Amino acid sequence: MFSSVAHLARANPFNTPHLQLVHDGLGDLRSSSPGPTGQPRRPRNLAAAAVEEQYSCDYGSGRFFILCGLGGIISCGTTHTALVPLDLVKCRMQVDPQKYKGIFNGFSVTLKEDGVRGLAKGWAPTFLGYSMQGLCKFGFYEVFKVLYSNMLGEENTYLWRTSLYLAASASAEFFADIALAPMEAAKVRIQTQPGYANTLRDAAPKMYKEEGLKAFYKGVAPLWMRQIPYTMMKFACFERTVEALYKFVVPKPRSECSKPEQLVVTFVAGYIAGVFCAIVSHPADSVVSVLNKEKGSSASLVLKRLGFKGVWKGLFARIIMIGTLTALQWFIYDSVKVYFRLPRPPPPEMPESLKKKLGLTQ
């Protein structure tokens, strides 16, 4: 499979060099015009700069997808685990709003009842579950991005790139949630049911004994409701925000930015995307939290009981969490790509063939 995907990726419109030499009819004029000292200007050797960028693998190769998956493991596993205390308080606000009246009150009550160690409840299923989710989310996103773009062709890929980002991310998240569901169910039980279990080792056998495999996968449909819109927004908003930042905000082209400068743009775009992600996915997140706490309940019953106001409980805490989380995930993921010297194509540009059709070239 990877060999066929790699073959397609070589002709992929996303697989463009970081530095391109585009003949605009002014190159000869610029190269021969005198400089400040009266000497002829030497043409900038951008091709030589591009050659110096040595990649560890080809774009769309099996190694590329595997290392992207590794980047997903590192970015999702570490960030979600680091934010376990905030996630714990957010979940408790959703399932027991009478007791946990707000984010600060939630922390105060939790510290009073469980101590500092209580804030780390559920760290093991969080780390395992979101590491597996990150592997599938980022790894499969790159796979589907290549496959769908080659199905569309170069011109349609550019014209419909937002739809492509949405489709590729939704496809990837479908599989990622199947990997996440068992650990998410265990995490919510540990965090929201006092006395049920303190560790994953205690919770998993108890859940299986009570409800069988259903205990681990009954929340997968609400997870899809929460995570697929979230991930679609996360990837599409990030990709288009990066494109807009380089076009309207960053004062120089991406090819002239240093790696640290590029990573700053990545972080900013990630945070902007994260705010929208939190808003889009929060109602389903509330349903998942309550559903995994209660035995024998269903998503429709929970949604009916919570009502419109109830599903938005804990939104402020989630905006802080998801905004920070998404920014850090994109920053770490892009840093992993830099570390392993993976191809990182710049924001897409209109193909020359499309420019000619639209009469944008002379």
UniProtKB/Swiss-Prot annotation:
It catalyses: phosphate(in) + H(+)(in) = phosphate(out) + H(+)(out). Gene3D superfamilies: Mitochondrial carrier domain. SUPFAM superfamilies: Mitochondrial carrier (SSF103506). Residues 87-121, 184-218, 285-314 are mitochondrial matrix. Interacts with PPIF; the interaction is impaired by CsA. PANTHER family: SOLUTE CARRIER FAMILY 25 (MITOCHONDRIAL CARRIER PHOSPHATE CARRIER), MEMBER 3, LIKE-RELATED-RELATED, SOLUTE CARRIER FAMILY 25 MEMBER 3. This is Solute carrier family 25 member 3. The lineage of its organism: Eukaryota, Metazoa, Chordata, Craniata, Vertebrata.
